[in-house]
């Protein structure tokens, strides 16, 4: 029996400095050994395995580091796994006893750590834990050190968690007293541990009310401390406290006894009961939530951190419930949180924070984690009924916070549940519009965003809603303008803001859903906006400003639609901007303040529109437009700087008709100027070098000029409600951003520094963000600073050196002056802003690869030195990276910066300075890399090694981070650095300075193990080792071990584990699946289904996906563990996650063939087919994969479907849609391969059709779409499959009714245009399959198509009123209908009744087809593309069509239309040209995009060229092919059909066109499938044969290529290009023709393709002049020989290959020159060698037969030019007759070949020797009995011999008869069959009829026997 071994003896020989590493490695091995022992072995050797661990703690405790302590605990856990509870209890008692009365704190810590970890793992299995509780309690006293108390309290919390109910009251009191004393500690570690204990005690509800009240006050007190980990713990405790108070309250109410602190003191016996009542779960939850909400609004929660902690507590309370419980109690949650909100009109931060928190809870917590598809709709209904509608009735009862929250939550739910419109949505729309009309300014953004989300989901009311809002806005302005001038109107800003923003927002929805509106609605927007701005000049100030604001904002929405809308209005827009952004008026200083404010307000609104124009119309920026915009912006900048601030009262007053005060608007104006300049700088070829603008940015950044006008810092913070008081005034937002290497924590979400200030940015509502949230808008002051920094970084690169120097000097002076001042906050803001600016422009310099002058570098170093003095860890990464950029850009002296930094780092005594500099060293090494000399590199490496063990935490961590980032650069110069680097990393992990428990013994207050730092180091190391890990198994295994331990440490410390996951990801990239990877796999998949930790879940999904891509073994292991079920569940919770979909697709692609049953059943179930058979894979796989119980239960559930989570819910429509997509893919790919899985799909056809029917009849748009796509796939792939039970019946025949009904469902009133269009095309394809045999069977579908055609034609009166053909959808559906009818014409070739059905409409259809195809060509390829068109005009018919809509449907329909026109062109060309020459096209709306003056009657090839060019250009744009099946194949057929000699002559063989055609064909021949390749070959052949110089080429007589005429030579060159395409096509399939002879596809289509190519090659070769043709013949012969090596091809297409050889030989014989004869002899010789080599090789039988038949063909077809005296011919004949002796299988073939050769060659005198040899050899072998089947041979030989008489010259016929008749007479006796004898008789009679005398004389000379035989044959023939 193998036992685990932990050798401690060798530690005595190990030096102390190495003992830590040795112990750790030994424990790693020991843990593996323990894990591999079975349960019985571990139980029998329990004490034996335990003793070494006890000894290790006792003897070598001082060498046990923090990670070792955790590893030691894991050893105990592995030892105890699976053992009974009493064994585990007994073992743990050993550790308790081992430190009895011990004073050594190190040993105590080690034992406490082991016990804590073991109780965490096995606490639920150990019944009696009082001993452990008292043990931990003993070491929790406040008289002990922080380290001991922290671990002891952690252990105590584990015990309390599992055994609190069985612990007596006295002990609980003592524990609580101890906890209270520890709660007042100054150590964060101890405080967190004490809070964990308190949390579990509170869960037992065994504390008195007075204690609960004390604890609440304590929590409020501590919540003001700025520590995110502490906040999380406080939040959990608040949640537990509220639950305990709720239980107390419920119990007191049930007992009808008031519960007060005084009563508690007097009735302790009553309170201290040993049993706990069970309370109603809902009631307890309701009370607890109410308590938390009351605490949130209480006076104690006066800090933002206190409120954030309470929000976290509410969130924790939710997370502790079941998801279904929270959704069921959604009404209660709404009532408690929202309906009890107080009315607040304050603009303070806490008020905004309260709004933020409510929205966070409802949208981000409840909405994203607890609501499924059904409860989401219920949630909308509850919010509507309990918040929005009541608010509409009485605004005093519902707070605006509640309304905003309800709207934000509803918008979020709508964005996820899009796809189906319900009656509830209509009710919601009406309510929202009514709230809008209330004119509440504070609700404007939420209302606008909700309307946008709602109308995106339910687009049908878009048009009426837009018109209603326009009418209301016009009415409001009319009312405003109608007031008398003497009456000062009181402007309701809210109604105008609401209407304006809502219109802007809804227009975005209209642009995204253009089929539901008329194009004229967009023109209405522009014209209305233009009128408002123009007419404002005639109004009073208030009304004018209201109109200006609305006009510019609506124009901002208009220009955001892009160039297709903006281009034609650009001139008017530029005039508007010129007027609004004019030069600074000369009398600006004499203007009153109101006039100045009005001017500034006008400029601000115009700038917002300009910014929108810059963002969405970059393509329109010509040099002239750029110049104008720069002038506009410079005017605004000068205006901003032209006046100074005046009276305090004036600058803080709100500006009329605006949302801002003067100070706010001033900041926003400058911010917009910066934003516009920055957008301008991003244009290609644009550089800004305006020094005045640069100085303005510097003033804003380094002098904080934006704060001018504010008296105090407090006033700055309080001026806006969107910035936290924690934020330093004037500092950039990047200062508070999360570092790149860290992930945002939960508290970062709850306690933001900034809140979205959407009211300051009207552009936010037109953002094209895919997020459901209203886009984040930073507060105005913050936005100004950020924009200034961004613009400065972009501009500084383009400045001359002198300007750079002066600017840097200003910055240096600014930082230096503030350094010695007392304004610390201002100093910090300026230094941070300056640093971010430096970092930004250095990054820009780096991207541009520009060097820096010496003076600039020295100033930069001086500035960075000043910034280094700022003691803030947040700035360290930016400073160090700035140094790296600087070193890289200072290329004249690349190492001078590094040398300076190394020297300063070594000499500096300031820890912060050392940390910055050492990290800078790492980044410089990474950036400069090989540019650093080796000596400097070694110095830097040695310095890093020293600093990696520094006693200062900050320095050490920065140094280790520097080591990790520079590891790659160092290793390239010093490869030996990587040797044993894993051990070096381990040594850093085991440093005494990293042992947080021991460090806490030294009274340090707060320490946490930096597991993320070491994980990052390990990840860098793995990437550097790379493929070497495959060969170095020890290093790879050790890396796996370190990753596993770091994962455990990250879980313990709560660190971000992304880097640990990345370690695993990269390990699996370079190494095979580790045997001990189960823990990591379970960890990943547990995170994936855990919605309570969304960020960790997101990371886990990404890492899992990357590993699956890189490691197939890992992927297979996960799939066998049934993790696809988990992924489906996880996908249903976040259905838009692309990575989850990709994971499923990977598995579907890999296992759809081997596991087709499971996949089909799961996919069918997901799409709603519930009664499918079991979809579970065999449980035997679980046994084979050694899955533990936890993994199987996690992924697999039980074996019964009823208990499997996968089968217990209704899935979201997004999940169903993706499942339908997967099912469609599965069907298409499986049926294409026609393998065994296809038979299974055939057996499930009824379920597949039912799934398609269920989806296509759904009320959800996307499910309808998925259903029709699935139905189309089924029709396409199963239409040719016959029913297995009835061979003459199609498989789909029985489903005709279901399929037809699905089409009918698309035409209901609420169907969308897209669905109608899709159903029309699929219906036409269904008819085209021929499944509907008669017109009566197809009547239902044909009627639908006919109705659609009649409704869509423009000449039909009243088509506008059709329920589907209205607004712009009428054009969309018209093209879709034409496409469907075009498909009918294409299918009419196979479906007879369609010809008659089409005949009555064919002319009308043809004209519309031509219009549509011409319109498509103009839009897609014309000189003016879509971006050139105006999508919305108002005056002409031409401009009433939105080209985006047309192009969208054209791209899905044009190919069908092109096919139909091609068919008509070939069958009834006069019809097409008659239409083209008539006036039928002139009045059509579709044809407005195509105007020409071509006379098609006289230039008929022109329309061919039109069709050809449309197809050709479409092949160059992949997007035009996506909507079709086999698009390239169909296009090539069209191009081949329309190809004429005239088209080739005038167009295709043009010098400019031909190369493009060839390039495209080369690309396609390499990438398309075999069928498409074949169509390309046919096209190439036809193109070659249509060469204009065809006749001149073939009959060109020349001895040299160089002597050809130029036209002929040019044509030869072009033809060679086509021949190259054919050769390339052959190389794709024939391995022997390419340098890499890899195997190619061997299916029948591929074989047919080779034959087609070879035949085309021969046909094209025959066009060339003779001198070239011969070379091509040689090439063809070589190709033929290579093809013969392909056994599979010969098996499929041998006869076709021989036919091709026949064609080649015939052509060569026809040419009849010496070279051709030589080539034929060479070929014959090669064939003979092949025949001899393969004659005994059974594997090459096909090749042998082909070679034999080829030689026969050569001797047969080339006989006129061959000489039979050649030795090679004689050798072949010998082989032929040799085969007659033994080849029984091929005897008949060989015999026929002999007779054929004899007959054919008898015609040619040069081959007479061959005939003589055949006769001689035949007679000899027959006489000797050597022929295997002599009777059969004679039956063929004698008639052939007698037939030769006809071809024998007259002078030799007598001698021939003298030979042939005796031979016939002698051997005819062997002929047994009467028919054969009769045939011989016929031949003899024919001879006797020609030469009777000679024949009779010869017969008389025969022997009696021979004579008798001849007579019998003749008599038999006569009879």
UniProtKB/Swiss-Prot annotation:
Chain positions found as Phosphothreonine: 48
Keyword Cell wall biogenesis/degradation listed: no
Keywords: Cytoplasm, Cytoplasmic vesicle, Endocytosis, Golgi apparatus, Nucleus, Phosphoprotein, Repeat
Disrupted-gene phenotype: Defective in endocytosis. Displays substantially delayed constriction of the actomyosin ring and dissociation of type 2 myosin and septum materials at the end of cytokinesis.
HEAT repeat ranges per the UniProt record: 106-145, 166-204, 378-416, 457-497, 783-820, 854-892, 894-930, 935-972, 1265-1301, 1336-1378, 1526-1552, 1553-1589, 1674-1714, 1722-1760, 1767-1806, 1832-1869
UniProt modified residues of type Phosphoserine: 45
Keyword Nucleus: yes
Location(s) in or outside the cell: Cytoplasm; Cytoplasmic vesicle; Nucleus; Golgi apparatus
Function: Required for endocytosis. Also involved in cytokinesis and cell division.
Name the record gives this protein: Pof6 interactor protein 1
Taxonomic placement: Eukaryota, Fungi, Dikarya, Ascomycota, Taphrinomycotina
């Amino acid at each position: 029996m193998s036992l685990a071994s932990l050798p401690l003896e060798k530690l005595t020989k190990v030096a102390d400095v190495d003992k830590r590493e040795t112990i750790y490695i030994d424990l790693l091995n020991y843990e593996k050994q323990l894990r591999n022992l079975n349960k019985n072995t571990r139980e029998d050797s329990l004490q034996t395995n335990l003793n070494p661990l006890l000894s290790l703690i006792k003897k070598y405790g001082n060498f046990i580091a923090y990670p070792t302590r955790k590893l030691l605990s894991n050893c105990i856990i592995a030892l105890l796994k699976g053992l009974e509870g009493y064994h585990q209890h007994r073992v743990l008692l050993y550790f308790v006893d081992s430190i009895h009365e011990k004073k050594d704190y190190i040993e105590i810590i080690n034992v406490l750590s082991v016990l804590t970890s073991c109780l965490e793992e096995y606490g639920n299995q150990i019944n009696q834990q009082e001993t452990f509780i008292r043990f931990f309690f003993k070491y929790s006293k406040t008289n002990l050190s922080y380290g001991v108390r922290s671990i002891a309290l952690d252990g105590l919390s584990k015990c309390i968690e599992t055994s609190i109910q069985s612990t007596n009251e006295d002990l609980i009191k003592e524990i609580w007293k101890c906890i209270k004393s520890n709660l007042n500690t100054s150590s964060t570690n101890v405080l967190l541990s004490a809070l964990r204990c308190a949390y579990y005690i509170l869960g037992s509800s065994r504390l008195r009310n007075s204690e609960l009240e004390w604890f609440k006050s304590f929590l409020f007190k501590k919540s003001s401390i700025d520590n995110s980990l502490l906040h999380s713990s406080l939040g959990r405790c608040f949640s537990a406290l509220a639950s305990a108070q709720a239980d107390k309250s419920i119990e007191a109410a049930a007992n009808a006894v008031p519960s007060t602190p005084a009563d508690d003191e007097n009735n302790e016996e009553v309170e201290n009961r040993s049993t706990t009542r069970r309370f109603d779960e809902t009631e307890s939850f309701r009370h607890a939530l109410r308590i938390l909400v009351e605490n949130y609004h209480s006076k104690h929660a006066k800090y933002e951190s206190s409120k954030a902690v309470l929000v976290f507590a509410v969130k924790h309370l939710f997370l502790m419930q079941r998801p279904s419980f929270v959704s069921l109690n959604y009404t209660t949650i709404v009532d408690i949180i929202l309906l009890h909100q107080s009315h607040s009109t304050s603009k303070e931060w806490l008020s905004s924070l309260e709004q933020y928190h409510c929205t966070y809870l409802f949208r981000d917590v409840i909405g994203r984690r607890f609501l499924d598809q059904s409860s989401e709709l219920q949630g909308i209904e509850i919010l509507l009924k309990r918040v929005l509608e009541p608010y509409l009735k009485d605004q005093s009862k519902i707070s605006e916070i509640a309304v905003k929250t309800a709207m934000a939550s509803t918008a979020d739910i709508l964005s996820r549940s899009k796809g189906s419109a319900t009656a509830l949505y209509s009710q919601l729309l009406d309510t929202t519009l009514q709230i809008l009309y209330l004119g509440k300014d504070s609700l404007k953004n939420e209302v606008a965003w909700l309307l946008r989300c709602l109308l995106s989901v339910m687009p049908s009311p878009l048009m009426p809603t837009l018109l209603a809002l326009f009418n209301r806005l016009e009415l409001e302005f009319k009312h405003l303008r109608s007031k008398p001038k003497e009456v000062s109107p009181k402007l309701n800003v809210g109604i105008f803001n609401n209407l304006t923003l809502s219109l802007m927002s809804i227009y975005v929805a209209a642009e995204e859903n253009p089929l539901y509106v008329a194009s004229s609605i967009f023109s209405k927007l522009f014209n209305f906006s233009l009128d408002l701005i123009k007419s404002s000049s005639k109004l009073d100030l208030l009304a004018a400003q209201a109109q200006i604001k609305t006009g510019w904002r609506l124009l901002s929405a208009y220009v955001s639609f892009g160039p297709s809308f903006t281009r034609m209005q650009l001139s008017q827009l530029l005039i508007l901007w010129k007027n609004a952004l004019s030069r600074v008026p000369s009398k600006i200083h004499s203007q009153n303040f109101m006039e100045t404010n009005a001017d500034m307000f006008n400029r601000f609104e115009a700038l917002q529109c300009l910014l929108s124009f810059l963002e969405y119309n970059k393509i329109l920026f010509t040099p002239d437009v750029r110049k104008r915009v720069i002038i506009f912006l410079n005017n605004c900048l000068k205006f901003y700087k032209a006046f100074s601030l005046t009276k305090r009262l004036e600058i803080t007053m709100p500006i009329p008709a605006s949302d801002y005060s003067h100070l706010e608007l001033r900041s926003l104006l400058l911010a917009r100027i910066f934003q516009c300049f920055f957008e301008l700088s991003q244009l290609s070829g644009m550089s800004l070098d305006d020094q005045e603008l640069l100085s303005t940015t510097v003033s804003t950044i380094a002098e904080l000029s934006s704060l001018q006008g504010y008296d105090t810092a407090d006033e700055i913070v309080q001026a806006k409600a969107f910035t936290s008081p924690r934020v330093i005034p004037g500092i950039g937002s990047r200062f508070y951003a999360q570092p790149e290497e860290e992930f945002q924590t939960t508290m970062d979400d709850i306690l933001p520094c900034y809140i979205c200030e959407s009211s300051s940015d009207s552009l936010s509502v037109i953002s094209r963000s895919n997020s459901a949230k209203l886009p984040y808008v930073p507060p105005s002051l913050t936005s100004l600073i950020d924009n200034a920094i961004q613009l400065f970084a972009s501009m500084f690169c383009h400045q001359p050196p002198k300007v750079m120097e002066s600017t840097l000097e200003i910055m240096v002076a600014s930082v230096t002056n503030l350094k010695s001042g007392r304004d610390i906050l201002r100093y910090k803001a300026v230094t941070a802003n300056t640093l971010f600016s430096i970092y930004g422009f250095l990054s820009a310099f780096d991207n541009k690869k520009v060097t820096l002058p010496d003076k600039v570098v020295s100033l930069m170093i001086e500035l960075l030195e000043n910034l280094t003095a700022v003691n803030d860890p947040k700035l360290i990464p930016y400073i160090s990276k700035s140094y790296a950029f600087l070193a890289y850009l200072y290329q004249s002296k690349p190492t001078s910066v590094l040398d300076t930094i190394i020297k300063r780092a070594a000499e500096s005594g300031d820890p912060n300075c050392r940390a910055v500099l050492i990290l800078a060293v790492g980044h410089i090494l990474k950036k400069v890399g090989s540019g650093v000399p080796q000596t400097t590199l070694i110095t830097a490496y040695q310095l890093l090694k020293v600093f990696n063990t520094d006693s200062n935490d900050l320095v050490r961590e920065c140094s280790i981070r520097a080591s990790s980032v520079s590891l790659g650069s160092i290793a390239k110069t010093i490869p030996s650095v990587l040797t044993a680097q894993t051990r070096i990393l381990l040594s850093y992990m085991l440093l005494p300075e990293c042992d947080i428990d021991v460090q806490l013994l030294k009274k340090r207050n707060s320490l946490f193990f930096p597991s993320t730092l070491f994980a990052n180091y390990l990840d860098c190391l793995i990437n550097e080792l790379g493929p070497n890990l495959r060969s170095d198994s020890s290093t790879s295994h050790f890396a796996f071990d370190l990753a596993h331990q770091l994962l455990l440490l990250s879980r313990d410390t709560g660190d971000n584990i992304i880097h640990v996951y990345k370690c695993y990801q990269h390990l699996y990239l370079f190494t095979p699946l580790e045997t001990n990877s189960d823990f990591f796999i379970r960890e990943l998949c547990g995170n994936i289904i855990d919605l309570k930790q969304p960020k960790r879940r997101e990371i886990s999904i990404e890492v899992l996906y990357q590993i699956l891509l890189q490691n197939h073994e890992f992927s297979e292991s996960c799939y066998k563990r049934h993790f696809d079920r988990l992924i489906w569940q996880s996908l249903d919770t976040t259905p838009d996650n692309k990575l989850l979909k990709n994971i499923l697709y990977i598995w579907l692609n890999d296992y759809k063939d081997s596991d087709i049953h499971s996949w089909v059943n799961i996919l069918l179930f997901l799409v709603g087919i519930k009664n499918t058979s079991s979809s579970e894979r065999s449980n035997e796989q679980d046994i084979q994969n050694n899955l533990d119980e936890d993994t199987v239960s996690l992924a697999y559930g039980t074996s019964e479907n009823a208990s499997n989570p996968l089968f217990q819910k209704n899935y979201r429509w997004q999940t169903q849609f993706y499942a339908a997509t997967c099912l469609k893919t599965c069907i298409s790919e499986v049926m294409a391969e026609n393998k065994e899985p296809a038979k299974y799909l055939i057996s499930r056809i009824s379920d597949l059709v039912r799934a398609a029917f269920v989806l296509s009849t759904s009320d959800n748009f996307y499910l309808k779409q998925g259903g029709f796509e699935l139905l189309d796939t089924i029709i396409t792939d199963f239409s040719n499959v016959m029913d297995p039970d009835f061979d003459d019946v199609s498989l789909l025949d029985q489903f005709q009714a279901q399929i037809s009904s699905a089409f009918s469902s698309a035409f209901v009133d609420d169907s969308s245009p897209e669905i109608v269009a899709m159903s029309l095309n699929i219906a036409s394809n269904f008819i085209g399959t021929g499944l509907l045999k008669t017109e009566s069977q197809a009547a239902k579908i044909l009627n639908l198509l006919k109705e659609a055609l009649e409704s869509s034609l423009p000449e039909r009166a009243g088509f506008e009123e059709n329920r589907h053909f209205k607004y712009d959808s009428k054009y969309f559906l018209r093209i879709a209908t034409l496409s469907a009818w075009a498909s009918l014409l294409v299918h009419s070739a196979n479906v007879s009744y369609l010809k008659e059905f089409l005949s009555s409409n064919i002319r009308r259809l043809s004209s519309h087809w031509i219009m549509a195809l011409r319109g498509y060509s103009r839009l897609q390829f014309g000189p003016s593309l879509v971006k050139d068109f105006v999508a919305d005009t108002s005056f002409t018919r031409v401009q009433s069509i939105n080209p985006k809509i047309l192009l969208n449907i054209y791209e899905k329909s044009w190919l069908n239309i092109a096919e139909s026109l091609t068919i008509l062109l070939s069958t009834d060309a006069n019809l097409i040209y008659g239409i083209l020459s008539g006036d039928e096209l002139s009045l059509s709306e579709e044809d407005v995009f195509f105007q020409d003056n071509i006379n098609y009657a006289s230039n008929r090839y022109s329309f061919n060229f039109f069709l050809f060019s449309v197809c050709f250009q479409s092949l160059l744009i992949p997007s035009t092919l996506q909507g079709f099946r086999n698009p390239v194949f169909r296009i090539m057929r069209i191009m081949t059909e329309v190809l004429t000699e005239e088209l080739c002559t005038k167009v295709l063989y043009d010098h400019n066109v031909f190369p493009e055609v060839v390039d495209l064909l080369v690309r396609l021949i390499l990438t398309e499938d075999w069928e498409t390749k074949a169509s390309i070959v046919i096209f190439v052949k036809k193109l070659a044969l249509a060469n204009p110089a065809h006749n001149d080429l073939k009959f060109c007589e020349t001895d040299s290529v160089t002597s050809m005429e130029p036209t002929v030579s040019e044509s030869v060159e072009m033809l060679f290009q086509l021949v190259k395409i054919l050769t390339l096509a052959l190389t794709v399939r024939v391995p022997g023709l390419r340098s890499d002879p890899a195997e190619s596809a061997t299916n029948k289509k591929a074989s047919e393709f080779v034959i087609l190519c070879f035949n085309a090659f021969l046909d094209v070769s025959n066009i060339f002049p003779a001198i070239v043709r011969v070379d091509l013949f040689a090439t063809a012969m070589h190709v033929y020989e290579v093809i013969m090596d392909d056994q599979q091809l010969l098996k499929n297409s041998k006869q076709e290959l021989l036919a091709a050889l026949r064609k080649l030989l015939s052509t060569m014989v026809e040419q009849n020159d010496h070279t051709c004869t030589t080539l034929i002899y060479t070929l014959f010789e090669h064939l003979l060698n092949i025949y001899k080599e393969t004659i005994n090789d059974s594997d090459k039988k096909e090749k042998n037969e082909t070679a034999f038949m080829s030689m026969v063909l050569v001797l047969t077809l080339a006989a006129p030019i061959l000489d039979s005296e050649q030795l090679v011919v004689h050798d072949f004949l010998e082989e032929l007759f040799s085969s007659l002796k033994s080849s029984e299988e091929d005897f008949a073939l060989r015999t026929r070949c002999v007779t054929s050769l004899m007959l054919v060659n008898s015609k040619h005198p040069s081959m007479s020797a061959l005939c003589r040899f055949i006769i001689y050899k035949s007679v000899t072998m027959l006489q000797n009995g050597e022929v295997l089947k002599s009777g059969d041979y004679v039956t063929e030989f004698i008639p052939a011999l007698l037939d030769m008489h006809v071809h024998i010259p007259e002078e030799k016929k007598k001698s021939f008869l003298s030979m042939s008749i005796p031979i016939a007479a002698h051997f005819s006796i062997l002929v047994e069959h009467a028919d054969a004898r009769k045939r011989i008789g016929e031949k003899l009679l024919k001879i006797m009829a020609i030469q009777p005398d000679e024949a009779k004389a010869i017969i008389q000379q025969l022997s009696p026997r021979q004579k008798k035989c001849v007579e019998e044959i003749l008599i038999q023939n006569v009879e």
